[in-house]
Amino acid sequence: MLNKKIKKNHKEDWITELTNAITNPDELLRTLNLKSNTKYFKNIQVQKLFSLRVPKTFVSRMKKNDPFDPLLLQILPHTKELKNNHNFVQDPLEETKNVIIPGLIRKYNNRILLLLKTNCAINCRYCFRRYFPYSQHPGNKENLNLAIQYIKNQTDLNEVILSGGDPLMAKDHEIQWIVNTLSNIYHIKRLRIHTRLPIVIPSRITNNLCKILSTTRLKILIVTHINHAQEINHELQYNINKLHKLGITLLNQSVLLRGINDNAKILSQLSNKLFDINILPYYLHILDKVKSTTHFYVSEKQASIIVVELLSMISGFLVPKLVCEHPGKNSKIYINLNMK
């Protein structure tokens, strides 16, 4: 159980924290008392593939003097990213084929993805959209208005998923606009927000954002992205609790990552800590086979073994659903655990 004595004077200047993010690998390693090592970042090619970006609030949860820290391994550029495998491609889910208009992706029957923002507060090395052509999908007013018009015309839709990038990179007044606009479309019942920003910068959960999300007729769901229990600290607990008190549904999805969270003990710690802060474990994803991420991949067979062991360690409602996603399918695919 996390310590309940949490400071009440948390600042809300998340934009300052965003601006002060670390983008230089040398600075990051110095902060963590680690020596520069060419295999991590010296290869300019790796940096060009996908630059480093990590807020200091997230770095503060990393263990110093530990090159294998599970939070560090998620964000530090590594020459392993140059390893080629023909099964790992730039668009593993073929999302570009499902683009309706710039920034609007329809993969499912009753719900639609709106890419509200094209950037993130943190660059996770395993990101399945690390090669997504965001420059072709600017989140400007023109594209947003086209997206809204499409959603209005599609009466079979009842849920909008805000994605990105990270949708909470939008400022509060922008969130207010999209919430108000969608709430005026009678057939839209739910608004789901997929985000990692409050995890890495908890102060993003401003009082104003809470007010916006609690004064709409839409049912609000927030799906966080947390992969390891070490990511959860007192500041995150305090800010997540503000959302919980408003009755907002809080779910979490994780990615199974080799060398980071690929064992049942680590996953059990994560599930327990998530529930301690009122977030329900929802999905455990097999890594999408995006180029430059082969070193993170855990096979479906090994993942099944891990989850079967996890079932014996924690209550069933704390066990996330093991899933993968295939291009062309209109839903996630549940992985068979082969239990006898």
Curated annotation (Swiss-Prot):
Domain Radical SAM core, residue spans: 106-321
Cofactor: binding details: Binds 1 [4Fe-4S] cluster. The cluster is coordinated with 3 cysteines and an exchangeable S-adenosyl-L-methionine.
Cofactor: [4Fe-4S] cluster; pyridoxal 5'-phosphate
Domain of life where this protein originates: Bacteria
Keywords on record: 4Fe-4S, Iron, Iron-sulfur, Isomerase, Metal-binding, Pyridoxal phosphate, S-adenosyl-L-methionine
Pfam name, any one: Fer4_12
Reactions the enzyme catalyzes: L-lysine = D-beta-lysine
Protein known as: L-lysine 2,3-aminomutase
